């Protein structure tokens, strides 16, 4: 027994209670503590300040698509360390860590399903997998999605969340920009709608290719969108950048994106847009 316990009465001493990890999440915007279950129910959007946190690709697609008849495309494709690349870590070690962390094989998931009973192909980037970087597998899976969209004559939607091309795959990664853009040109020739949704962040080679090539370009609130980051630009031009530079609210004022849609409204809003474009009955709000 410590000296303080001898002085104070036992009933006035409160012993420290260990709170299990993972119950509370701190919002990066308002710094408020949020009950994790409440945050998950709110689609990873802070109920205090409406800040859109990052959400996993699989969870995003599960909440976006109708519940039944979902087929994952290109799920057997896995990245390979063709260049035997090594920086501070070997590329194959980075892949192993990322796969263990995310339970995914690479940084994009592509699914064929339906949205309010309308056939659709949807893709989503997994930012937790090496920053959602574009690899050869990401490019190939995306092209799988485009080809399936052409085959079924159904719209395609892509949710971007990426830092750009994957450094560890060098020129192979850069080539995916041209490859995916060429695939989207086939979609356009067939007059099949492609909607791009840019989430935080959509940067680098992804923003310079598939993220900006939508027939309709949508963004989530306060998403960082651009090629180089604002800090890099500021250091290069040596000038103070405008407030909220490269944020979705800034870009919509400049006409770079078409719409800003909150995550909770995304499913219905895109369903409504696609129904109008494809001349289908307008969906009823759930």
UniProtKB/Swiss-Prot annotation:
Q: How is the cofactor bound?
A: Binds 1 zinc ion per subunit.
Entry cofactors = Zn(2+)
In which residues is Zn(2+) bound?
Answer: 27, 30, 46, 49
Q: Which reaction is catalysed here?
A: N(6)-carboxybiotinyl-L-lysyl-[protein] + acetyl-CoA = N(6)-biotinyl-L-lysyl-[protein] + malonyl-CoA
Question: EC number(s) per UniProt?
Answer: 2.1.3.15
Q: Name one GO biological process term.
A: fatty acid biosynthetic process
Please tell me where this protein is predominantly located.
cytoplasm
Subunit-level organization: Acetyl-CoA carboxylase is a heterohexamer composed of biotin carboxyl carrier protein (AccB), biotin carboxylase (AccC) and two subunits each of ACCase subunit alpha (AccA) and ACCase subunit beta (AccD).
Outline what the protein does.
Component of the acetyl coenzyme A carboxylase (ACC) complex. Biotin carboxylase (BC) catalyzes the carboxylation of biotin on its carrier protein (BCCP) and then the CO(2) group is transferred by the transcarboxylase to acetyl-CoA to form malonyl-CoA.
What family is this protein classified in? Answer: Belongs to the AccD/PCCB family.
Instruction: Identify this protein by name.
Output: Acetyl-coenzyme A carboxylase carboxyl transferase subunit beta
UniProt organism field: Wigglesworthia glossinidia brevipalpis
């Amino acid at each position: 027994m410590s000296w303080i316990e001898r002085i104070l009465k036992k009933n006035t001493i409160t012993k420290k209670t260990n709170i299990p990890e993972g119950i509370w999440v701190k919002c990066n915007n308002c710094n408020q503590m949020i009950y994790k279950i409440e945050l998950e129910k709110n689609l990873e959007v802070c109920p205090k300040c409406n800040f859109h946190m990052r959400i996993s690709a699989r969870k995003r697609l599960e909440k976006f698509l109708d519940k039944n008849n979902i087929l994952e495309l290109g799920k057997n494709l896995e990245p390979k360390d063709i260049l035997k690349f090594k920086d501070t870590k070997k590329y194959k070690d980075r892949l192993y860590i990322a796969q263990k962390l995310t339970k995914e094989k690479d940084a994009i998931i592509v699914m064929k399903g339906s949205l309010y009973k309308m056939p659709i192909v949807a893709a989503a980037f997994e930012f937790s997998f090496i920053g959602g970087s574009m690899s050869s597998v990401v490019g190939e899976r995306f092209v799988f999605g485009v080809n399936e969209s052409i085959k079924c004559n159904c719209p395609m939607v892509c949710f971007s969340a990426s830092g750009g091309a994957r450094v560890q795959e060098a020129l192979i990664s850069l080539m995916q920009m041209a490859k995916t853009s060429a695939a989207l040109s086939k979609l356009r020739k067939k007059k099949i709608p492609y909607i791009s949704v840019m989430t935080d962040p959509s940067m680098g080679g992804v923003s310079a290719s598939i993220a900006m090539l939508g027939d309709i370009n949508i963004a989530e609130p306060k998403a960082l969108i651009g090629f180089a980051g604002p800090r890099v630009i500021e250091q290069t031009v040596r000038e103070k950048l405008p407030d909220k530079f490269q944020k979705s609210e800034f870009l919509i004022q400049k006409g770079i994106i078409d719409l800003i849609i909150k995550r909770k409204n995304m499913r219905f809003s895109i369903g409504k847009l696609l129904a109008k474009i494809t001349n289908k009955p307008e969906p009823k709000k759930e």
